[in-house]
């Protein structure tokens, strides 16, 4: 008697979620997964199948229609999404990132994304990471359960070999899509699947399970390293985009690297190379006190100001441009610069004259504001407020009729300040 693909433990675990979003490509793995979930009464009414149309194959629309029809037959809610991604570099990675970004955007609290990855997929992932020279994090490969966006990600088939999924599909006479690109060995995973794994299986029939078990050992080692990182630097528990340097300077090189890895992962940053970690430690952490060095990779920057490391992402590096706030007090958003301004009524604060022209600008140098009874240079105020230099260029400046009226989050000009709650506004940057 064959074991069920979905164990009672998995049924109990998945039953706790409000909604189960199934990544449904229409291939063997996701077709079996969807059928198993739809055939499990405690779970069948929680399902939403999501098909991602990458637009790579000429058959994409036919695949989408196939998936929609199967969901109609099973009585499962279905949505399809065509995604855009950069096709100039690593197509596999770019498509994967775009796919997970969309899945993440769908997840709400107590939702779970369920994917059909199986044991053979896990073995391939471990080998691909090994060939890239990955460390413990990479060799830990895919986890059965992890966080994703506001919800969770589950892979209930991760210990099931592909042959068990094929057996289930034959018994239930399921039809699935065969993506022709899966045979193209120019893609690394396909090369491994069609050229390398058959040789390994010929010599060691149980090799996929053994490799997968090694990933489990690496996951435990990864968890232990994360515990060590918090022990070495308790500030990690509260750290966001900045990290105090002093507590880690006395650690050994490897343990500093471990702390940095934890910090970057917490901020959802793909880990850089060992060479980059070496540069962060030697060029930034152990730099002179008055130095402000920078290390960059993949549109990410790590910088230093005073006794802190600062992490900057792409939308924090791009400098925003001036824009008129024509719909004041409606919110104003800079989608490419991680800035969202809102105006809220206040007991005291910024006064906006009737029919005023409001414009949001950013520092270029030479700005002055009349504040606390004096005309002050904005540059000196930024220094007094101990704002890191690269942040200064991104602090929104509210100009009213061409006069600097407010430095958002820091100061309101005396010329535009009021204590009348009927007239006062507070400008808030919600980024």
Swiss-Prot record:
The gene is tilS. One of its GO terms (cellular component) is cytoplasm. Belongs to the tRNA(Ile)-lysidine synthase family. It is found in: Cytoplasm. One of its GO terms (biological process) is tRNA modification. One of its GO terms (molecular function) is ATP binding. NCBIfam families: lysidine_TilS_C, lysidine_TilS_N. Gene3D superfamilies: 1.20.59.20, HUPs. Ligates lysine onto the cytidine present at position 34 of the AUA codon-specific tRNA(Ile) that contains the anticodon CAU, in an ATP-dependent manner. Cytidine is converted to lysidine, thus changing the amino acid specificity of the tRNA from methionine to isoleucine. It is an enzyme of class 6 (ligase). It catalyses: cytidine(34) in tRNA(Ile2) + L-lysine + ATP = lysidine(34) in tRNA(Ile2) + AMP + diphosphate + H(+). It holds the Pfam family TilS. Keywords: ATP-binding, Cytoplasm, Ligase, Nucleotide-binding, tRNA processing. Its EC number is 6.3.4.19. InterPro entries: Lysidine-tRNA-synth_C, Rossmann-like_a/b/a_fold, TilS/TtcA_N, tRNA_Ile_lys_synt, tRNA_Ile_lys_synt_N, tRNA_Ile_lys_synt_subst-bd. This is tRNA(Ile)-lysidine synthase. ATP binds at residues 25-30. The lineage of its organism: Bacteria, Pseudomonadati, Pseudomonadota, Gammaproteobacteria, Legionellales. The N-terminal region contains the highly conserved SGGXDS motif, predicted to be a P-loop motif involved in ATP binding.
């Amino acid at each position: 008697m064959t074991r069920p693909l979905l164990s009672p433990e998995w049924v109990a675990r998945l039953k706790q979620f409000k909604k189960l979003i199934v990544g449904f490509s229409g291939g063997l793995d996701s077709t079996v997964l969807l059928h198993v979930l739809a055939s499990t009464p405690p779970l069948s009414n929680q399902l939403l199948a999501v098909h991602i149309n990458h637009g790579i194959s000429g058959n994409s629309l036919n695949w989408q229609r196939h998936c929609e029809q199967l969901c109609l037959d099973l009585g499962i809610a279905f949505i399809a999404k065509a995604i855009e991604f950069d096709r100039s570099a690593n197509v596999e990675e770019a498509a994967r990132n775009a796919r997970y970004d969309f899945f993440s955007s769908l997840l709400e609290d107590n939702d779970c994304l369920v994917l059909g990855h199986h044991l053979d997929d896990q073995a391939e992932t471990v080998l691909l990471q090994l060939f890239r020279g990955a460390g413990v994090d990479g060799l830990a490969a895919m986890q059965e359960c992890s966080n994703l966006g506001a919800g969770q990600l589950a892979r209930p088939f991760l210990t099931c070999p592909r042959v068990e999924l094929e057996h289930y599909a034959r018994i239930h006479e399921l039809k699935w899509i065969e993506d022709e690109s899966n045979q193209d060995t120019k893609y690394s995973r396909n090369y491994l699947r069609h050229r390398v794994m058959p040789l390994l299986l010929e010599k060691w029939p149980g090799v996929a399970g053994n490799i997968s078990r090694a990933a489990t050992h690496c996951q435990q080692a990864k968890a232990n390293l994360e515990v060590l990182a918090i022990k070495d630097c308790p500030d990690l528990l509260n750290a966001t985009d900045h990290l105090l340097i002093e507590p880690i300077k006395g650690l050994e090189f490897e343990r500093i690297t471990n702390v940095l890895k934890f910090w970057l992962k917490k901020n959802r940053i793909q880990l850089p190379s060992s060479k980059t970690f070496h540069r962060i430690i030697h060029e930034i952490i152990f730099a002179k006190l008055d130095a402000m060095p920078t290390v960059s990779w993949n549109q990410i920057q790590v910088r230093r100001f005073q006794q802190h490391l600062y992490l900057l992402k792409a939308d924090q590096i791009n400098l925003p441009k001036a824009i008129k706030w024509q719909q004041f007090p409606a919110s104003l958003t800079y989608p490419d610069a991680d800035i969202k301004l809102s105006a809220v009524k206040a007991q005291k604060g910024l006064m906006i004259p009737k029919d005023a022209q409001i414009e949001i600008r950013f520092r270029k140098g030479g700005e002055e504001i009349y504040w606390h009874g004096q005309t002050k240079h904005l540059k000196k105020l930024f220094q007094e407020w101990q704002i890191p230099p690269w942040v200064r260029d991104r602090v929104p400046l509210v100009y009213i009729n061409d006069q600097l009226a407010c430095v958002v989050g820091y100061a309101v000009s005396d010329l535009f300040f009021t204590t009348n709650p009927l007239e006062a506004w507070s400008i808030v940057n919600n980024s």
